[in-house]
Amino acid sequence: MGDNRKVRVVVGGVFDILHVGHVHFLKMAKELGDELIVIVAHDETVKRRKGRPPINPAEDRAELLKSIRYVDDVVIGEPGEISIDLIKRLKPDVIALGPDQDFSCEELKKRLRKEGINAEVIRLPYLYKSDRAKTSKIIQRIIETFCE
C-alpha cells in the first residue's frame, strides 16, 4: 500500500488589504501539496515589524483568507517572530516563503532542523508583478485618490 498522507503546505504573512498578488501566491503554494494552511501575522507582530498596526485586525484577515478556495485552514500566529511551537503543531511538509519575505530559506531550514522539523523550505517567485499587487502601493493610491 502507498502512503496516503496528504502533503501539508504552510505559508505565513500579514495579508493586509488582500490583493491579486496574495491570491496568486496562495494558488502557487497550494500547488505544492494537498492542503494549504495559512498563518496570519498577529497584530502585535505587524506593528513591531512594519512600524504601524495593520489596517485590518488579524481576525478579519483570517476570515478573508478562509474564503479563498486554495486555503484549507487559517491560524493566527503568536506575537513575535516565527513560532517554532506553532510550526511543530501544524506539522508541515513544505513551508513556502513569499518573494518579499525577509527570511533566509537556509537560516529557517537550519533553525527548523535543530528543532527536529524536516519540512522543505522554498521561496516562491513573483508571479504577478504590478503596483496593484503591493499593499503599500494600494495604500498610496487610496491616499492620492481620496485624500488630496
Swiss-Prot record:
Keywords: ATP-binding, FAD, Flavoprotein, FMN, Nucleotide-binding, Nucleotidyltransferase, Transferase
Enzyme class, spelled out: transferase
Any one GO molecular-function label of the UniProt entry: ATP binding
Signal peptide positions on this chain: none
Pathway listed: Cofactor biosynthesis; FAD biosynthesis; FAD from FMN: step 1/1
Highest rank taxon of the organism: Archaea
Annotated catalysed reactions: FMN + ATP + H(+) = FAD + diphosphate
Cofactor: a divalent metal cation
Residues where ATP binds: V14, F15, H19, V20, G21, H22, D100
GO annotation, biological process: FAD biosynthetic process; FMN metabolic process
Entry similarity comment: Belongs to the archaeal FAD synthase family.
Description of how the protein assembles with itself and partners: Homodimer.
NCBIfam families assigned to the protein according to its UniProt record, in alphabetical order: cyt_tran_rel
Protein purpose: Catalyzes the transfer of the AMP portion of ATP to flavin mononucleotide (FMN) to produce flavin adenine dinucleotide (FAD) coenzyme.
Identification of the protein by name: FAD synthase
Organism whose genome encodes this protein: Pyrococcus furiosus (strain ATCC 43587 / DSM 3638 / JCM 8422 / Vc1)
The encoding gene: ribL
